[in-house]
Amino acid sequence: HHQQQQDAATEGSSSGRARRPSGASTSSKDSYLGSTSVISDSAKELCKAVSVSLGLGVEALEHLSSGEQLRGDCMYAPLLGGPPVVRPTPCLPLVECKGSLLDDGPGKGTEETAEYTPFKGGYNKGLEAESLGCSGSGEAGSSGTLELPSTLSLYKSGTLDEAAAYQTRDYYNFPLALAGQPPPPHPRRIKLENPLDYGSAWAAAAAQCRYGDLASLHGGGAAGPGSGSPSTAASSSWHTLFTTEEGQLYGLCGGGGGSGPGEAGAVAPYGYTRPPQGLTGQEGDFPAPEVWYPGGVVSRVPYPNPSCVKSEMGPWMESYSGPYGDMRLETARDHVLPIDYYFPPQKTCLICGDEASGCHYGALTCGSCKVFFKRAAEGKQKYLCASRNDCTIDKFRRKNCPSCRLRKCYEAGMTLGARKLKKLGNLKLQEEGESSSASSPTEDTTQKLTVSHIEGYECQPIFLNVLEAIEPGVVCAGHDNNQPDSFAALLSSLNELGERQLVHVVKWAKALPGFRNLHVDDQMAVIQYSWMGLMVFAMGWRSFTNVNSRMLYFAPDLVFNEYRMHKSRMYSQCVRMRHLSQEFGWLQITPQEFLCMKALLLFSIIPVDGLKNQKFFDELRMNYIKELDRIIACKRKNPTSCSRRFYQLTKLLDSVQPIARELHQFTFDLLIKSHMVSVDFPEMMAEIISVQVPKILSGKVKPIYFHTQ
């Protein structure tokens, strides 16, 4: 025994073994460390080498005293061989470590006495089995043996079979991307413990972690023995739509969604799965201590409340708990940015692409093309193209070829008979408006400025020319079809597509005849309530015209077949949308009927309490209904046939509203749990879904049906 103490005093050994003498006192931590604060150089080198390999800064360790380094910064502080040890004494017994990283030869050894401060219970995680070999019983008072290989790997992407062999091990809380456990056969929830205590000396090393969010790793790994289980009330509040997918709970820890074949065991480093919210973990990043989350997302720290979601909760939202439970449901528009803030009105000339000043002669044009068409169409001069009638007409070359410019005007639907349709944002009657403004209030004048000029048009009305001219073009979703289909990827692409289409819906609505004469609040409300129905109706038409209603043609780069319908977890909604698309073929809807029905769909959902100028809205809606009836009568001379056709089209319009409501419910539930299923919501989509959609779901906003439901 005397010989062992002499060996312990010898420096330069490489084994790094430290053993606690039997006579050491454990009553006082400070007195104990004060008497045994000498650390060998080899032990320091071992600690530094392991810290560097893990990406931890060594500079922060050098400023601490030897006792503080041993207490707070030794990476082997908890006992690695078993579950956390709970002892009445303030410190755990010494861990017995054998280091092979610095191997100067067998027989040499250095023994030092030290004491380690344990972390909070439930945070002990073991290093990867192939990186560190650990042995020891999990009982109190036992010592574990830690063996280091010649090369310490930073992280390892293992398979599920390899992870299953070590699934009973308590993992040590380090930023290593460890292979997670196999997905459970049944849904479960894992309790997230309190975050690490950053008041200790460990904070200095944690601040320099290469991933920058070491404080956020409290949710990684498997649940500790003391995690417990969620209550029945907590379990019942989970929506069944977002719980399981093919026997797997949202994918592996850190996976961020489903993965294709061959990727089941691949796990990326944790630092690359967090959203870019900052370089270091903040206090607000941690959830409440008793918040429960699905087991598959324990490696994802819940998002802090985003700025686009309100912070005031309505009484009917009390059943939604979690980070999004305090969502504010807007009752007034004081805190909502106007939709013009996101979508400034932009109109381009259909002839040359310059900024359009309004609808001239039945088409959106600039002032230059308006004057050119008037002179060219009324004049008797014949224009001939010097080339092949395919000249480029743009803002800078529109004067080069009058023949091609005039031809493009006719192709855009410009006619001399459309002069009565004035600027789109301001449908003013010159003489009638001036005379009525002096004798009646402004509101009465505005009500007379509806699309009354539309009445009396012939079988090819100018109204249809306007609808064809302002119809939005093709919008792509930006979906990467080379990646395997997953729930998160498909729904994120749909949300991005919805954001892009919403921009076109706003521009299209503002170009509709009579729309700008609505009260500005009514304009915003009508768009925000009807956008879902408009997109569903337009998507059904695209599916009918492009793929014969066999699939859902959301965008050229996002077409849903049967597999994607199931993968998106909205199969029932997709089936109803496909049936709507098939109705276009069964009823033989013409493009003119579709355009007028789509415009009428914009004016088919309003608040129960009414709009600011409800009377004018009703008059405008009635004019669009008359236009639909006039389009029907153009090709049918039999009144009975016209009535039957009007009945069919209005029934089709009514069928859009239940589909839109189902999608409203789906998107709202998805927004509530978006941070758990890795689905991205653009800012404007999140704003409308969180503020306006609840009004529809709660019954404060209802659609207008043609027929009794």
Curated annotation (Swiss-Prot):
<dbReference type="GO" id="GO:1903076">
    <property type="term" value="P:regulation of protein localization to plasma membrane"/>
</dbReference>
<feature type="region of interest" description="Interaction with HIPK3">
    <location>
        <begin position="361"/>
        <end position="451"/>
    </location>
</feature>
<keyword id="KW-0963">Cytoplasm</keyword>
<dbReference type="InterPro" id="IPR013088">
    <property type="entry name" value="Znf_NHR/GATA"/>
</dbReference>
<feature type="region of interest" description="Interaction with ZNF318">
    <location>
        <begin position="1"/>
        <end position="376"/>
    </location>
</feature>
<comment type="similarity">
    <text>Belongs to the nuclear hormone receptor family. NR3 subfamily.</text>
</comment>
<dbReference type="Pfam" id="PF00105">
    <property type="entry name" value="zf-C4"/>
</dbReference>
<dbReference type="GO" id="GO:0030522">
    <property type="term" value="P:intracellular receptor signaling pathway"/>
</dbReference>
<keyword id="KW-0449">Lipoprotein</keyword>
<keyword id="KW-0446">Lipid-binding</keyword>
<comment type="subunit">
    <text>Binds DNA as a homodimer. Part of a ternary complex containing AR, EFCAB6/DJBP and PARK7. Interacts with HIPK3 and NR0B2 in the presence of androgen. The ligand binding domain interacts with KAT7/HBO1 in the presence of dihydrotestosterone. Interacts with EFCAB6/DJBP, PQBP1, RANBP9, RBAK, SPDEF, SRA1, TGFB1I1 and RREB1. Interacts with ZMIZ1/ZIMP10 and ZMIZ2/ZMIP7 which both enhance its transactivation activity. Interacts with SLC30A9 and RAD54L2/ARIP4. Interacts with MACROD1 (via macro domain).</text>
</comment>
<dbReference type="GO" id="GO:0000976">
    <property type="term" value="F:transcription cis-regulatory region binding"/>
</dbReference>
<keyword id="KW-0832">Ubl conjugation</keyword>
<comment type="function">
    <text>Steroid hormone receptors are ligand-activated transcription factors that regulate eukaryotic gene expression and affect cellular proliferation and differentiation in target tissues. Transcription factor activity is modulated by bound coactivator and corepressor proteins like ZBTB7A that recruits NCOR1 and NCOR2 to the androgen response elements/ARE on target genes, negatively regulating androgen receptor signaling and androgen-induced cell proliferation. Transcription activation is also down-regulated by NR0B2. Activated, but not phosphorylated, by HIPK3 and ZIPK/DAPK3.</text>
</comment>
<feature type="DNA-binding region" description="Nuclear receptor">
    <location>
        <begin position="348"/>
        <end position="421"/>
    </location>
</feature>
<dbReference type="GO" id="GO:0005634">
    <property type="term" value="C:nucleus"/>
</dbReference>
<feature type="cross-link" description="Glycyl lysine isopeptide (Lys-Gly) (interchain with G-Cter in SUMO)">
    <location>
        <position position="191"/>
    </location>
</feature>
<dbReference type="Pfam" id="PF00104">
    <property type="entry name" value="Hormone_recep"/>
</dbReference>
<feature type="region of interest" description="Interaction with LPXN">
    <location>
        <begin position="341"/>
        <end position="708"/>
    </location>
</feature>
<feature type="region of interest" description="Interaction with CCAR1">
    <location>
        <begin position="381"/>
        <end position="708"/>
    </location>
</feature>
<feature type="modified residue" description="Phosphoserine">
    <location>
        <position position="65"/>
    </location>
</feature>
<feature type="modified residue" description="Phosphotyrosine; by CSK">
    <location>
        <position position="705"/>
    </location>
</feature>
<dbReference type="GO" id="GO:0005496">
    <property type="term" value="F:steroid binding"/>
</dbReference>
<keyword id="KW-0564">Palmitate</keyword>
<keyword id="KW-0479">Metal-binding</keyword>
<dbReference type="GO" id="GO:0005497">
    <property type="term" value="F:androgen binding"/>
</dbReference>
<protein>
    <recommendedName>
        <fullName>Androgen receptor</fullName>
    </recommendedName>
</protein>
<feature type="cross-link" description="Glycyl lysine isopeptide (Lys-Gly) (interchain with G-Cter in ubiquitin)">
    <location>
        <position position="637"/>
    </location>
</feature>
<feature type="compositionally biased region" description="Low complexity">
    <location>
        <begin position="12"/>
        <end position="28"/>
    </location>
</feature>
<feature type="cross-link" description="Glycyl lysine isopeptide (Lys-Gly) (interchain with G-Cter in ubiquitin)">
    <location>
        <position position="635"/>
    </location>
</feature>
<feature type="modified residue" description="Phosphotyrosine; by CSK and TNK2">
    <location>
        <position position="172"/>
    </location>
</feature>
<feature type="modified residue" description="Phosphotyrosine; by CSK">
    <location>
        <position position="32"/>
    </location>
</feature>
<feature type="region of interest" description="Interaction with KAT7">
    <location>
        <begin position="414"/>
        <end position="708"/>
    </location>
</feature>
<dbReference type="GO" id="GO:2001237">
    <property type="term" value="P:negative regulation of extrinsic apoptotic signaling pathway"/>
</dbReference>
<feature type="modified residue" description="Phosphotyrosine; by CSK">
    <location>
        <position position="116"/>
    </location>
</feature>
<dbReference type="InterPro" id="IPR001628">
    <property type="entry name" value="Znf_hrmn_rcpt"/>
</dbReference>
<feature type="binding site">
    <location>
        <position position="542"/>
    </location>
    <ligand>
        <name>17beta-hydroxy-5alpha-androstan-3-one</name>
    </ligand>
</feature>
<feature type="modified residue" description="Phosphotyrosine; by CSK">
    <location>
        <position position="198"/>
    </location>
</feature>
<feature type="modified residue" description="Phosphotyrosine; by CSK">
    <location>
        <position position="324"/>
    </location>
</feature>
<feature type="binding site">
    <location>
        <position position="667"/>
    </location>
    <ligand>
        <name>17beta-hydroxy-5alpha-androstan-3-one</name>
    </ligand>
</feature>
<feature type="modified residue" description="Phosphotyrosine; by CSK">
    <location>
        <position position="341"/>
    </location>
</feature>
<keyword id="KW-0597">Phosphoprotein</keyword>
